[in-house]
Curated annotation (Swiss-Prot):
Organism classification: Bacteria, Bacillati, Bacillota, Bacilli, Bacillales
Binding-site positions, GTP: 16, 66, 97, 158, 262-264
Family, as annotated: Belongs to the radical SAM superfamily. MoaA family.
Protein name according to UniProt: GTP 3',8-cyclase
GO biological process, one term: Mo-molybdopterin cofactor biosynthetic process
Key word S-adenosyl-L-methionine present: yes
Gene assigned in the entry: moaA
UniProt keyword annotation of Metal-binding present: yes
Cofactor, free-text remark: Binds 2 [4Fe-4S] clusters. Binds 1 [4Fe-4S] cluster coordinated with 3 cysteines and an exchangeable S-adenosyl-L-methionine and 1 [4Fe-4S] cluster coordinated with 3 cysteines and the GTP-derived substrate.
InterPro entries, per the entry: Aldolase_TIM (IPR013785), Elp3/MiaA/NifB-like_rSAM (IPR006638), MoaA (IPR013483), MoaA_NifB_PqqE_Fe-S-bd_CS (IPR000385), MoaA_twitch (IPR010505), MoCo_biosynth_MoaA/MoaC (IPR050105), rSAM (IPR007197)
GO MF assignments: 4 iron, 4 sulfur cluster binding; cyclic pyranopterin monophosphate synthase activity; GTP 3',8'-cyclase activity; GTP binding; metal ion binding; S-adenosyl-L-methionine binding
Organism: Listeria welshimeri serovar 6b (strain ATCC 35897 / DSM 20650 / CCUG 15529 / CIP 8149 / NCTC 11857 / SLCC 5334 / V8)
SMART domains listed in its UniProt record: Elp3
């Protein structure tokens, strides 16, 4: 098998597929509150295009898929997309990232279709604040979604917490306590200068050393734990006596570019080899032309930088506010 390897020796076996750029929320770090223009439906990859693409990609070593958005559960055919991917025997793991507003309703069908596990965005445990950060989200719906995911066996459940200075950094302790009684993995993620967030990221950025300082301040003893299924770049820890774990993902202050094994496919059919690099290849016209398609995929990988620009900003102490041109919801979270 010919593997998808870049010039730095990194083998790519994981792809994140955005199935829509639309979302029912407007999280402050992801999308502006208004003035948005979304892709017309005919510009969005169809279920058959996604499945056909993956039937080819597995022949080159891709074996893990994460479905993202926008909010992927807005797709009326999301269960059929999962079912189509689940029918490809070479795919070992299918996961989804969701805001969980519709997860309680769809978790069972998704599990039956072949979904392996779920990541849930949850940036506050206080209902009013959660509603403010998401501009309309209902915390109880997320909690119901978590419970349903547990019931149907989507495991491990991971909660993604974007740490925002002055908005939710006083909840670190609450999130840590959340792991004591629940077998979940809470992942604290640095605020990144992507798209809409790029205009204000310096003011809202908080280094993740804050997490460990919070543990020390309240006397929580913690230890590193072995890899969690699908843990990716997260460094994981467990508070003594806790059922669950917590992790830190620091793409800004301590990048993990040297071990990056992922590609991204946008909802409109562009391959991106690096989240923070604007270069991308339009592969949609060649979905049914495997030779040409794989040439474009390999070209994107060949052009992949050794490190992303966020790392360079900190190394050079520039920390400019220049964002990428696509919003996170357009790239795929």
């Amino acid at each position: 098998m010919q593997l998808l390897k870049d010039k730095f020796g990194r083998v790519h076996d994981y792809i994140r597929i955005s199935v829509t750029d639309r979302c029912n929320l407007r999280c402050v770090y992801c999308m502006p509150e208004e003035g948005l223009t979304f892709l017309p439906h005919e510009k969005v990859l169809s279920k058959d295009e996604i499945v056909s693409f993956m039937e080819l990609m597995v022949q080159f070593g891709i074996k893990k898929v994460r479905i993202t958005g926008g909010e992927p559960l807005l797709r009326t055919d999301i269960v059929e997309i999962v079912r189509g991917l689940g029918a490809i025997p070479e795919i070992e793991d299918i996961s989804i990232t969701t805001n969980a507003m519709y997860l309680a309703k769809k978790a069972e069908a998704l599990k039956e279709a072949g979904l392996t596990r779920v990541n849930i965005s949850l940036d506050s445990l206080h209902a009013d604040r959660f509603q403010a950060i998401t501009r309309g989200g209902r915390l109880q719906k997320v909690l119901d979604g978590i419970q349903k995911a547990e019931e149907v066996g989507l495991f491990p459940i991971k909660l993604n917490v974007v740490l925002i200075k002055g908005q939710n950094d006083d909840e670190i302790t609450d999130f840590l306590k959340f792991t004591k009684d629940k077998d979940i993995n809470i992942r604290f993620i640095e605020y990144m200068p992507i798209g809409h967030a790029g205009t204000s990221w310096k003011e809202k950025y908080l280094p993740l050393d804050t997490i460990f300082e919070a543990c020390d301040a309240i006397g929580f003893e913690y230890e590193a734990v072995d890899s969690i299924r699908g843990n990716g770049p997260s460094e994981n820890f467990r508070i003594k006596g806790a059922k669950g774990t917590f992790g830190v993902i620091h793409p800004v202050s301590s990048h993990f570019c040297d071990s990056c094994n992922r590609l991204r496919l946008t909802a409109d059919g562009y391959i991106k080899a690096c989240l923070y690099w604007d270069e991308e290849m339009n592969i949609r016209p060649f979905i049914h032309e495997p030779v040409k398609l794989m040439q474009l995929v390999q070209k994107a990988i060949d052009n992949k930088p050794e490190n992303h620009e966020m790392a360079l900003k900190l190394q050079d102490e520039v920390q400019s506010n220049k964002p990428t041109w696509r919003r996170m919801s357009q790239i795929g979270g």
